[in-house]
Amino acid sequence: MEYNPPNTRERIAARRQRLRQPSSEPAIPGWRRRFIDGLQSGRIVSGAVFVVSCLALFYVLFSSQFRVQTVEVVGVEFLSPERIVNAVPLRGWPIWLIDEEQAVAPLLRSPFVEHARLSLILPDRARIVIVERQPVIYWRSGGVDYLVDRQGFVIEPATVAPPADALVIVDSSNLPVEPQMQLDPDALALARELAWRLPNELGLRPAQIGWDFGLGVFIRTEQDQMVVFGRSERLTRKLMILAYLLNDGTPFTYLDLRPMNPFYQNRTDGRS
C-alpha cells in the first residue's frame, strides 16, 4: 500500500485563487442593506407619504364630516327658503363634488330669480344667495295684471289689484303674456319716464298709460284725449310740442308725436 500525503497547501492556495477571481453572478444585498438604501434614497419615505395621502384623500372625499349638512338661503322675499332648498337638493352631497354653477341652474328657471350664487363653506355648509326680480310695473293684457321687473321680465300674474299709485301699462293689443318673457324695454322705460315727467313738467296726470303693437306707447287724458309717443327717441321735443298745444288751448282728441311733423285731430263724434 502506497501512502499519499495530503496536499493541504495546494488546496488552500487554489481556494484563495478562486476567491480573488471576480464572480459573474450579481451579489444580492440583504434586507437590512436594502432597507438602509431605501431610507437614504427617500423611496421608503416617499412611498409612506403617498399611502398616507391616498388615505387622507379618501377620508376627505367620502367622510360624513365633509358632506353638506346645513343650507343657508339669503336674499329671498317672495320665495320661501324651503322652496329654494327643495329646488337645490344639496344635503348629503360630498362638498368637494358639487359644481356651484350647475347646482343653482334650476333656480334661474324661476321667473322670480334674477341671479343665484352658491358658496360652499368647509366642512359642511352651503350658502345660496338669491337676487329676486322686483316688480315695478303692472302690465295689463286681456284683463289680467302681470308683475314686471325693471328689465321688462314678466314675473307672474298679480294676485291682488294694483295699488292706486302703481304704474299700470294697458296693452290694447292684448298680446299673450307668459312668465319669464321679456317685454319691450324701451316701452317700459318710456312709460316710467312719462309717469314722472308729465305731472312734474307739464302738470298733466295721465288717466291711462297704454301700449299698442302698432302705435307704441300712448297716454289718455281725463278729457279722453289720446297722445301717441311711440318710442323714447326725441322725447324732450315731443313733450315741448305737447306742452305748447296744452298751453295754447288747442283743441284735439288725437295727437301723434311720432313723425318729425306731428299731427293732431279734433273729432266731435267722440272717436279718436
From Swiss-Prot:
Domain POTRA: 66-133
Cytoplasmic face of the membrane: 1-43
Keyword Plastid tagged: no
Compartments where located: Cell membrane
PANTHER family the UniProt entry points to: CELL DIVISION PROTEIN DIVIB, CELL DIVISION PROTEIN FTSQ
Function: Essential cell division protein.
Domain of life: Bacteria
Keywords in alphabetical order: Cell cycle, Cell division, Cell membrane, Membrane, Transmembrane, Transmembrane helix
Main location, first listed in the record: membrane
Residue stretches spanning the membrane: 44-64
Family: Belongs to the FtsQ/DivIB family. FtsQ subfamily.
Assigned GO CC terms: cell division site; plasma membrane
Cited InterPro entries: Cell_div_FtsQ/DivIB_C, FtsQ, FtsQ_DivIB, POTRA, POTRA_FtsQ_type
PROSITE patterns assigned: POTRA (PS51779)
Swiss-Prot/TrEMBL GO biological process terms: cell septum assembly; FtsZ-dependent cytokinesis
Pfam families linked to this entry: FtsQ_DivIB_C, POTRA_1
Regions of this protein lying in the Extracellular compartment: 65-272
Name of the gene encoding the protein in the UniProt record: ftsQ
Membrane topology (UniProt): Single-pass type II membrane protein
Name the UniProt record assigns to this protein: Cell division protein FtsQ
